[in-house]
Amino acid sequence: VHWTAEEKSAITAIWGKVDVAAIGGEALCRLLIVYPWTQRFFTSFGNLSNAAAIQSNAQVKAHGKKVFTAFGDAVKNPEGVKDTFAKLSELHCDKLHVDPVNFKLLGQILITVLAAHFGKDFTPNVQAAYQKLVSVVAHALAHQYH
């Protein structure tokens, strides 16, 4: 995948303002609420019975931070995404058996959360760059499945 200087700049400019714990927690909460079947991968997290329970669940927030800390590695090195996520792809495929469609769903949720947080700064060009990045990350995470 070829990355232009403009795309890299758009991605890093927004990501530099991201509170990974807040954005990550919100994104994972939204995933679990909007796509409730994804909750089956998080049964060890305790009460996920409704939106309020999910939004107040410390394990959901902590895992969201962990997920988007890893996503930050893609922001830093978009050319190396496949290598960066090789072990996570293996984990999600071989041990967790996560349907790779869920990676795309989480990417879409991230874009929604970023747009909500950054408003006018999340221009169509910024959105296009993030759309490209979340697609590349989702593909890398699904790599072990192929």
Swiss-Prot record:
Q: Which BP terms in the Gene Ontology apply to this protein?
A: hydrogen peroxide catabolic process
Where does the record place a coiled coil?
none
Q: Which organism is it from?
A: Erythrolamprus miliaris (South American water snake)
Q: Listed GO cellular component terms?
A: blood microparticle; haptoglobin-hemoglobin complex; hemoglobin complex
Give the source's domain of life in one word: Eukaryota
Biological function: Involved in oxygen transport from the lung to the various peripheral tissues.
Q: Which PANTHER family match?
A: HEMOGLOBIN FAMILY MEMBER (PTHR11442), HEMOGLOBIN SUBUNIT EPSILON (PTHR11442:SF7)
Give the record's family classification.
Belongs to the globin family.
Is Isomerase among the key words of this record?
no
Domain Globin intervals: 2-146
Q: What is this protein called?
A: Hemoglobin subunit beta
Q: Which UniProt keywords apply?
A: Heme, Iron, Metal-binding, Oxygen transport, Transport
Gene3D superfamilies reported for this sequence:
Globins (1.10.490.10)
| Pfam families (alphabetical) | Globin
How would you summarize the oligomeric state and partners of this protein? Heterotetramer of two alpha chains and two beta chains. Oxygenation results in dissociation to dimers.
Q: Does the keyword Cell division apply?
A: no
Tissue spec. comment: Red blood cells.
MF terms per GO, please? haptoglobin binding; heme binding; metal ion binding; organic acid binding; oxygen binding; oxygen carrier activity; peroxidase activity
